[in-house]
Amino acid sequence: HIFGRFGITAFALSGLDIALWDIAGKAAGVPLHRLIGGARRTRIPCYASFLRYTEPRLVAQYCERALGEGYTAIKLHEIDDAAVQAARHAVPAQVPLTVDVNCEWRLREAIEVASRWRSHALLWLEEPVFPPEDFRALRAVGEASGIPLAAGENLCFATQFEAMLDAGAVQ
């Protein structure tokens, strides 16, 4: 599913769009953020985002390391209950924990797993279902599990984002 079901063409076009904005900023002699309206913030919060390690011991170890380095939130890419549980045990309850499963499951399995993960107090669960543009399924997972959902990295067009929001698929 690496590029959703709309293909690599839309992603290639986004690269061209970025290049054109960069050229416009250089031609105007200003940083791009100024060209499109200026900075609204001088600082933004960030989180430590991990690879999928699978092994609970490693997940806990990386969580502890990230907290020691000053990160104030953690994003996992785990799909296994034990790995997510290990992270939650390593991360204090007041530290936001999120999980991006990269469209791992069909609806039924997504609901089952997300419901089990409710006890981990996730800040959000990201893209739990395939296909990524099945917005009804996304909404169903959120409603059944009570976990806020995040999605959109596989969407290409404003109309897709509009449909996702209209469907109530993400919170």
Where are these regions (language model features)?
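Short acidic active-site motifs
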Residues: 83, 109, 133-137, 159-160
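Catalytic cores of alpha/beta
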Residues: 107-117, 156-169
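Catalytic beta/alpha-barrel core
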Residues: 72-79, 98-103, 121-132, 148-156, ...
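Secondary-structure transition/capping motifs at alpha-helix termini
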Residues: 93-95, 167-170
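Oxyanion-binding "anion nests"
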Residues: 142, 149, 165
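N-terminal capping/lid subdomain adjacent to the active-site entrance of alpha/beta enzymes
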Residues: 1-98, 102-111, 115-119, 144
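Short amphipathic alpha-helical segments
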Residues: 88, 138-139
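Short glycine-/small-residue-rich flexible loop motifs, especially phosphate/cofactor-binding loops
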Residues: 22, 63, 139, 161-162
